[in-house]
Amino acid sequence: MVITDLVQIRRMGEKNRDENLRFRKYLKTRVWVERQFRHAAEEVHAEIDCRQCAECCRVTEVQLAKRDIEHLAKFLGIREKDFLEQYTMTGVDGELILKRTAAAGCVFLDGNECTVYEARPGNCERFPHLLKGAGSIPSRMWQFVDRATYCPIVYNWMERAKDLTKFRR
């Protein structure tokens, strides 16, 4: 049974943070068959409609690539220069990100709907980076410990992955 309640995800993700860090170390010390992790991720993705949640849009910064800027400007029917002025800002690490507010998150989020979904940036399209990402899932575990505190897909996948690997909790 998957958990999708965001309050419960936050609470359990924070409660399990130390355990998830131990799980990350556990995965690094052994050789795993990527297929089992991917299969578990595919199952969870199929059970949870990402578009019903949009929590990632509220809590994360979306770093932009040049092609994201080109694509979004074209989608919105404006010049790239205007897009940069109206819809971007500098992130905490100095990178170019989509404009956001602490209260509402991403500038393109309206309730739980992405108003530019068809043209969303590559980082948004690939999120939560379980099925789409560079390297094996175990090699990207550093990303998932924090994401398990706000993303139902990552939280539920991580719990299944612990069961798959017979990780002692």
Model-derived regions, located:
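Short loop/turn segments that flank or connect secondary-structure elements
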Residues: 1-169
